[in-house]
């Protein structure tokens, strides 16, 4: 992970003009959101699907209260994509997540599994020293509950945010997870380019000895329309960016990059 000061420097590079701003970590989604934790009586640990996401807060220039709007008076341009891949990739790299194995008696972290992305799934603890989690990278994974060692994984072809469940039928154990990229973060995650993060919802069930394979992904690339010649000036473009992030970006995505939950306005 980048030191906090370097993370702040990256985010400041995204600021819209000379706007007084503060960068907080975790952001408004918290260090842990609704994704269920789990507890293992075998280890005594709690397993937390944690979020590691900064957020930029700054005063919206000329804020005026509007009926029916969010009215947070925050400048949503802070931290939004610039269109420069070298800059935007650094900001995307700040959005992380991890599993924290926490000892509630000693009040300390025992081990941590770092994820490449944020908004990962809820946890399941089972007997046999196992924990399970689906993640935003499109995998369903089993770990050792005592050490965090990865033992098994299966590709889900979509991000998974729900917790898995386990049950028995005629004495045979199954584990089921509802896989699909969605929720508050996914609404504006701007992940439409990544096939694993598209909202391809399905119910996946596993058992020892199961041998069914998922069919190949058959997504069709979106048709990109021919863009009209830009006639607006620099100030008009900047104002349009401000208005978009104020009124549209919260659902349709930062920098007009939709997470795929609702239509992408670029196509």
What are these regions (language model features)?
Residues 1-226:
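Beta-sheet-rich non-transmembrane sensory/scaffold domains
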Residues 219-243:
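Electrostatic cytochrome c docking/interface patches
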